[in-house]
Amino acid sequence: MSKKYLGEQIDIHAGGEDLVFPHHENEIAQSEAANGKEFAKYWMHNAFLNIDNRKMSKSLGNFRTVREISEQYDLQVLRFFMLSAHYRNPLNFSADLMEASKNGLERIVNAADNLKFLKKNAANEKMTEEENKLFIQTDAFVADFERAMEDDFNTADAIAAVFDLVKFANSNTDSESSAEYLGKLFDLLVKLTDVLGLLVDKKEDILDEDIEKLIEERQAARKAKDFARADAIRDDLLEKGIVLKDTREGVQWKRA
């Protein structure tokens, strides 16, 4: 089957560590005997998934499917959780660890959203000499990321490099930053997270006229110190799935 769809040789072959012998050894023997070529260049054998420090199995009644998990969490959170440990190490699934993964992913997404917001409202277009010097410092994060991925697909350390970039971006940008500088930081963050399949560059949802009107009305209410009305509008928007965040640079919003 693999020969039919992938050819006589495979770049990467993955599977559970319990399949090394005899399953994968038999695949190698059959394929290389038939084709006279190396079957797979790289083998990636993952360790097992445990549930609350116990082996996941139907007999123990702790078996969880991806579909069941998706009812509680966005599957991007599950991806982040699985990438947070080296694939050759056992991974423990628990509600606490999933919440930690959710918070970690939100931290990255929020950084990306903030860079987009600042860029959209930036008064200056071109990078300053100081910003250029700052951006050069991000080369270290890229080097750390690439070093981790080249070290047997060490996604845990790669994510650590992404968090270093997030911390840098949060600490070295503000409303005075140029659009070019903010754009470069955003593009770099997207470039690294794309490698991991993490989608931080979410397309902005277009607000319909009613919601736009409510946001404008809330701003007017705040200006008039009618905070009760402003809070009521915020609650109304939340019911529509719109979360508002008041910042010094203006109002930011995102889908709940």
Go through the PLM ranges and name each one.
Residues 55-56, 62-256:
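Structural preference for alpha-helix termini/caps and helix-kink/transition segments
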